[in-house]
Amino acid sequence: MPSLKDLAKECGVSVATVSKALNDQPDIAAATRERIRVAARRMGYLPNAAARALKTNRTYNLGVLFVDERQSGLTHEYFSAVLDSFKVEAEKRGYDITFINHNISGRSMTYLEHCHYRSVDGVVIACVNFYDPQVVELVNSDVPVVTIDHVFNNRMAVLSDNVAGLKALVKQAWACGHRRIAFIHGEKTSVTENRIAGFYQACEELGLEIPEEYVRDGVYHDVERCAEETRALLALPQRPTCIIFPDDFSALGGYNALAEAGLSIPDDISVMGYDGIYLSRVVNPSLVTYQQNTAALGQTAADKLIELIEHPRVTLPEQLRVSGRLLSGRSVRSL
């Protein structure tokens, strides 16, 4: 394996210059830094982990706090894709990841205690109960934190633009001639609040009057619950012509309930999803949905967490919104 000295010789610079480039020090030209990094990748140079940790007072280990109470785990395609992108970017920057939990060898501990036990440099938090006292304790600690799809005061947050996503779906339904548009949303979280706001904002902009019974309390990733809410909508004296579901997976509940009622999608009723996962492309008919940009969400979260770790004095907490895109399908017909 090549050494720091070998890399310096290859690039025609001093060992000190190579060290500055690899440690992202500011007093080196950007072109020189990039040239050295390209050479390091080409030569397969890897810094000695122990020496690097001793020199920088960092472990180059990032914590991931992911608690999926619905037990869909990392098979939940949306969050799995976000965390995969986070991992790829972290590794590209020389960091490993560790999952944070309550248990180490049978010993119970708080999330913050686990972070200290593993000596992580920072933590990304996603898909948790953000009101859990242990999560709040971690967020309020001195550990650098980036949250995904939730905002804490004075903390870095990376957010999918859920307001824009629902507005895009409503306006697409409107453009297809639909005026009776229902929305089955997920459980009450900041994500849901933003989606509900986007739904009503679009309706207001379009001059749509939406009956209260058209907006239903569903549950993310819960097929049966969304099937129940679909049946409730079908039982109304004037049923909607288009239903927006909490996510693509739960839309399967709508597909099932509509089939049970002898209704055809989209001939009898139109359906929309959210997330843009692979399932939306293979279900029949293919689902009109809003695809969240999981690659950008994960990469941005990693970039911002590493900025907080490596440049704490100049990195300010901010809320970054990541746009998605509308995906066409055959589940909505023009009236």
Q: Model-predicted segments: where are they?
A:
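Bacterial carbohydrate/catabolite-sensing allosteric modules
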Residues: 1, 10, 42, 85-93, ...
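N-terminal helix-turn-helix DNA-binding module of bacterial transcription factors
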Residues: 1-60
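Alpha-helical recognition/docking segments in bacterial nutrient-uptake
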Residues: 2, 61-171, 175, 235
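Short, cationic motifs built from Arg/Lys/His that form the positively charged side of catalytic pockets
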Residues: 19-20, 33, 119, 195, ...
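Conserved acidic
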Residues: 24, 28, 50, 74, ...
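Short amphipathic alpha-helical segment that frequently serves as the phosphate-/nucleotide-binding helix
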Residues: 33, 79-83, 196
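Short gly/ser/thr-rich secondary-structure transition/capping motifs
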Residues: 42-48, 104-108, 127-128, 255
